[in-house]
């Protein structure tokens, strides 16, 4: 969990970093901003869990159908890119990159299994503490993968398997010739999911760890009829979530209710900001980069 400052300590921190702030009114604004962020995380949590679970299930089913097995070793051999299964025209350096990525994936999954076993996670200990079992099936491994590890696994799959997963999800592949959208969107969602899980700040998108690729932006602009998107505002992440909810066949009523609640949270904070701006003591504009 994050180490939080008290509100007074946070005010000192802001003053030390060039933001003029003092008094009970500006202190209350900081409290309001924290409450706003908490409401955002509460709104987003359930939707993020739904999307993560659904994407893992879709990917798992596609992989198992491709390899006709639930063996992790069959997945490595048949569904993961490597030196041996690279297309004939693949440059030598790319083949070696595929192989190194495969090694990294195997190591990452093995570390996840070992960590789960040490923590006595029954999803894993069941298979090692039972005489009749000698291998953890893919589906059990998917249950312990973090969203970041899941994204990396997707990135290591062959382009053919990624394409099948992308189509099963319903992604628009018209601008995604290399089938990178599926794992890059997972990485983008992972940043938000981790911020929520660790109770970090989400409203100003400081959580973002990657720059969106051109296909990521083009897909959303096309599918959601947007003129522009850059993932520099929380609204862009709301759009991404709504896109996946739509792909996952969540009802229009539920998606609209989600959007209305987000708009209400935004409106409530903006109303408070405008009051403080009117009386000339608004510090939140400095913190948020402009209060509107």
Summary of predicted features, one role per range:
Residues 1-191, 203-292:
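Extended intrinsically disordered or low-complexity regions, especially N/C-terminal cytosolic tails and loops
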Residues 199:
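Acidic/aromatic/glycine-rich contiguous surface patches that form carbohydrate-binding/processing clefts
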């Amino acid at each position: 969990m994050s180490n939080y400052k008290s509100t007074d300590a946070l005010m000192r921190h802001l003053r030390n970093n060039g933001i003029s702030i003092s008094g009970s009114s500006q202190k209350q604004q900081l409290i309001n901003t924290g409450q706003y962020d908490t409401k955002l995380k509460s709104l987003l949590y359930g939707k993020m869990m739904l999307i993560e679970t659904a994407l893992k299930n879709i990917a798992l089913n596609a992989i198992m159908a491709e390899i006709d097995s639930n063996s992790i070793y069959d997945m490595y051999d048949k569904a993961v890119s490597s030196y041996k299964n690279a297309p004939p025209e693949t440059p030598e350096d790319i083949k070696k990159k595929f192989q190194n990525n495969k090694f990294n994936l195997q190591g990452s999954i093995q570390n996840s299994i070992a960590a789960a076993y040490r923590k006595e996670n029954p999803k894993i200990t069941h298979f090692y503490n039972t005489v009749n079992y000698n291998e953890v099936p893919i589906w059990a491994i998917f249950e312990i993968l973090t969203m970041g590890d899941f994204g990396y696994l997707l990135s290591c799959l062959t382009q053919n398997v990624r394409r099948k997963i992308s189509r099963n999800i319903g992604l628009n592949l018209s601008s995604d010739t290399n089938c990178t959208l599926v794992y890059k969107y997972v990485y983008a969602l992972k940043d938000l999911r981790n911020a929520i899980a660790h109770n970090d700040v989400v409203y100003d998108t400081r959580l973002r760890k990657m720059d969106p690729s051109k296909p990521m932006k083009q897909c959303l602009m096309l599918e959601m009829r947007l003129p522009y998107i850059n993932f520099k505002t929380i609204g862009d992440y709301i759009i991404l979530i709504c896109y996946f909810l739509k792909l996952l066949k969540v009802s229009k009523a539920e998606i609209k209710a989600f959007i209305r609640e987000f708009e209400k949270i935004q409106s409530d904070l903006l109303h408070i900001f405008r009051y403080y701006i009117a009386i000339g003591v608004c510090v939140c504009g400095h913190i948020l980069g402009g209060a509107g």
